[in-house]
Structures are given as C-alpha cells and as structure tokens.
Amino acid sequence: NEMVELEARRGKLALEQGKYMLQDAQTRIVEAQPAVVVKTLQRHGDLVETLLEQESHARLVMGRQGEQHQDQAQAIGSHLENVIRTVKQPILVVMTEFEAPKRFMIAYDGSITAKKALNQVLTSPLLKGLECHLVMVSDAQSQATAELALVTESLMAANFNVVTAVCQGEVQTALEIYQLEHHIDLMVMGAYGHSRIREFFVGSNTTKMISKSHIPLLLLLR
C-alpha cells in the first residue's frame, strides 16, 4: 500500500530530524555551559501528552515562536499555548534571544493563588541572587503598600533584595511601563485568583501578554 509506505517514510524522516535537533541542542548547551550534564529524550506522539508524563520532575523552557512563526516577532507557537493551558509545572517562555536576567518582577495581587506563586519563588533556587521587584496594580495605595510590606518581609528573610511599587491604572499598561523604567529582565507570573490580575493573566490575556512581551516570562501555573 503506497499510503502506508509513504507514512512510514515520513515517520522515519521525522525521527531522524528529531535526532539531529536534539544533538544540535545538546552540543550548543555543552559548548555554552561545559559543566552542565545534558540528557536527551526522544519520544513519539503528542507533545502535551509526553510532557504530562514527565510533569512530576520537569521544568520547562520553551521558545515563544514555533517553527512556522519565526518571522513573526509577536506570534505564539501553537505548541506553547497548548502546553501552558495543560501543564501545571513552571514554564520559562523565552524570546528569540536570551540573556541571564539580573532582576525580575512579580505582579502581585494578594490572592491565595498569588501567595502560592510567591511561595514557589521563595523556595526555588532559580531566582536567588536576582533583584526582586514586587509590583501591585491598585487604586488603594495605602492598603496595597501595607500588604506589600508583609510580603517583602518574607522575601527579605529568603535573602532577596526587594524593591516594591504600587502602580495605578490599567494592569497591562502599568506593568509594561514599570518594566521599561526599571530595566526588568524577567517577568514572573502566577495563576492568580479572581481579581484584576486574574482577568489580565488568564485566557486570551495570557496570550496577549506573552505575544507583546520583550522579556522572558516565568509562568508559575500550579
């Protein structure tokens, strides 16, 4: 059967292409970080299903653009959006070029899920040594300042150098302005509660933020 033979050849070519891609990625990592031990895994099947199988011990780094969107600066690869909606482990979304960040920003709203995301920051070694900007978008200046003061104590106890700010206005605009003015290299976002931040970060707003961001985003999705 010609169709069966054609599919078999396509499958073999895809397998070989995947093998070469993994080898190339491994070589680039080893050349940049000789001390890093790199292990590769090639699987056949759906990407999201495979990542879910590895989810309990995986931390994901994914590029924003897929292969079909490399010439579109703000396009999001279809795989990335599907993974974000399904996988619950942290995902680092990177742009075309990546530099090690010196400072990161947490958009905080005081909800239970925001506190869970903050706890991941406190307990993870990944962000240690980076300057932390804790930012809240709220029209209630005094209340927000008091709430940030409590959170700042926890961050400082975990040896973070913390800068706090309360911004006013529309969430996306306020965060973008702060990011530019303070040279933020990394945005940290969680799956926030029923608030203005949640309205901004879930559903189509997540897609909007990722597509418009000029810096990497660390998504804390649990």
Where are the regions a protein language model picked out?
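A short alpha->beta transition loop at the rim of the catalytic pocket in nucleotide-sugar-dependent
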Residues: K88, S213-H214
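Short, ordered loop/turn segments at secondary-structure junctions
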Residues: G66-E67, T96-E97, V137-D139, Y192, ...
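Hydrophobic alpha-helical segments and helix pairs
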Residues: V36-V93
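Short, flexible, mixed-charge acidic loops at enzyme active sites
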Residues: N1
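Structural beta-alpha unit
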Residues: R10-V61, A157-M187, A191-F200, T207, ...
